[in-house]
């Protein structure tokens, strides 16, 4: 896939560590020739990311602070990206958060604050980020976010995050309609369970991975590299006719009825 994204400037939001889905995406995009811009919420996170990039000999076009809970921070971040890079051609939204206590027990016990927090970071952030990113996508482009089967079905303990992901998937469709006139595509990857830092907070996560190995058509779990390659496809011109879609990268588990 070398050269598939040559000369494309792509913003990646959500790299926390080497286990992050966003890190798998980073590797795929870099190997395809993309110029990468990264956003992080805090200086400390940015320092960790610099070390990670250096370790893997990946050169970033820019590192920018961005707190997606703040509209001002988002506006400032994309103003900085415009100043440093100019035009961008793609954006990876790999951001989600819910309080650990909301990811166990019954969904009916979800707190108001916990519900709003999950929606704000996991779903509304895509709306706010798209609003600013489209201003820099003067040549068209592609936006890809990450979702999960819990948006479509009841997954035990996924609770408030499942509802947030459902909101995210609906937003993908509405945003695809809004920015399509600018030749910008918006799609989502629904990945199977992957051992990320965020996944540790979901009660019973290991059991979910075992079920995939037993019941999915391919009888195996997916990894961050497979999700990375699928995301790279959506960001490339190979997917130029696709928008508003949610594509499952889960070894086919989503087709199984029980």
What are these regions (language model features)?
Residues 180, 185, 242-244:
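Short, small/polar-rich loop/turn modules that mediate ligand/substrate recognition or access, typified
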Residues 50-52, 181, 191-217, 256-258:
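A glycine/serine/threonine-rich, flexible loop-to-helix segment
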Residues 216-227, 238:
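A conserved structural motif in NAD(P)-dependent oxidoreductases
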Residues 232, 243-258:
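Short C-terminal tail/terminal secondary-structure segment
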Residues 2-38:
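Canonical Rossmann dinucleotide-binding motif of NAD(H)/NADP(H)-dependent dehydrogenases/reductases
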Residues 185-195, 235, 248-250:
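Conserved SDR Rossmann-fold cofactor-binding beta-strand/turn motif
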Residues 53-72:
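Rossmann-fold cofactor-recognition segment
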Residues 14-23, 27, 96-135, 139-181, ...:
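Catalytic loop of short-chain dehydrogenase/reductase
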């Amino acid at each position: 896939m070398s050269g598939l994204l040559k000369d494309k400037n792509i913003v990646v939001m959500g790299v926390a560590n080497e286990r992050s889905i966003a890190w798998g995406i980073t590797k795929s995009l870099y190997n395809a020739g993309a110029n990468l811009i990264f956003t992080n919420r805090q200086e400390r996170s940015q320092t960790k990311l610099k070390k990670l990039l250096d370790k893997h000999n990946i050169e970033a076009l820019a590192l920018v602070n961005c707190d997606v809970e703040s509209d001002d921070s988002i506006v400032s971040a994309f103003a900085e990206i415009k100043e440093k890079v100019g035009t961008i051609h793609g954006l990876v939204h790999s951001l989600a958060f819910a309080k650990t206590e909301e990811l166990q027990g019954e969904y009916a016990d979800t707190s108001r604050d916990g519900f709003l927090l999950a929606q704000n970071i996991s779903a509304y952030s895509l709306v706010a980020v798209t609003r600013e990113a489209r201003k820099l996508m003067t040549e068209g482009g592609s936006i890809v976010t990450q979702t999960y089967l819990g948006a479509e079905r009841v997954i035990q303990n996924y609770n408030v995050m499942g509802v947030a992901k459902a909101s995210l998937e609906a937003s993908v469709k509405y945003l695809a309609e809004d920015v399509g006139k600018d030749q910008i595509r918006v799609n989502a990857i629904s990945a199977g369970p992957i051992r990320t830092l965020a996944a540790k907070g979901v009660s019973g996560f290991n059991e979910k991975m075992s079920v995939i190995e037993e019941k999915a058509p391919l009888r195996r779990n997916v990894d961050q590299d497979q999700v990375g390659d699928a995301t790279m496809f959506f960001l490339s011109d190979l997917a130029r006719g696709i928008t508003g879609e949610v594509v499952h990268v889960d070894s086919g588990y989503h087709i199984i009825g029980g």
